[in-house]
Amino acid sequence: MSRRKARETAFKVVFQVDQVQADAKKAFDYLVLHDKLAEKNQGFSWDLIQGTLEKQAEIDQMIASYSREWALDRMSSVDRNIMRVAAYEILYLEDSQAVVAIDEAIEIAKKYGDEGSGSFVNAILDKILGEKNG
């Protein structure tokens, strides 16, 4: 559960940056205190945030290529930002287990998204993992 909280915090920060151009570090610092993110998971969460924001253009291209029915700017901002964080973890974090990252993203999507969010996020992330694995 602790890494889920770290992933959830990363999603919340990336979402805030996307929606209101929030300062990522300030948003992260606030959420660490507000959500009581354990110190041992703060580094992981911050790595997800920084990496996602740094690689966002590449990640967005990949998400867009697999979501043909939904343009990136037309899809739910919750779904979009959950997928960004999970895609970063799948593609760029060597010590990450992709299947776990996808499962966690689905659970976060069910919590914050709408009825179809979990399925949509799962479908796109499965395609991204498939491309990575060739």
Curated annotation (Swiss-Prot):
Tell me a Gene Ontology molecular-function term this record carries: RNA binding
Gene Ontology biological-process annotations: DNA-templated transcription termination; transcription antitermination
Q: Gene Ontology cellular component? A: cytosol
SUPFAM superfamilies xrefs: NusB-like
Give the family, as the similarity comment puts it.
Answer: Belongs to the NusB family.
**HAMAP family given for it?**
NusB
Q: Which domain of life is it from?
A: Bacteria
**Gene3D superfamilies from the UniProt entry:** NusB-like
Name used for this protein in its record = Transcription antitermination protein NusB
Q: Which keywords has UniProt assigned to this entry? A: RNA-binding, Transcription, Transcription antitermination, Transcription regulation
Asked if the Swiss-Prot or TrEMBL record annotates the protein with the keyword ATP-binding, the reply is no
User: Which organism does this sequence originate in?
Assistant: Syntrophomonas wolfei subsp. wolfei (strain DSM 2245B / Goettingen)
Keyword NADP appears in the UniProt entry? no
What functional role does this protein have?
A: Involved in transcription antitermination. Required for transcription of ribosomal RNA (rRNA) genes. Binds specifically to the boxA antiterminator sequence of the ribosomal RNA (rrn) operons.
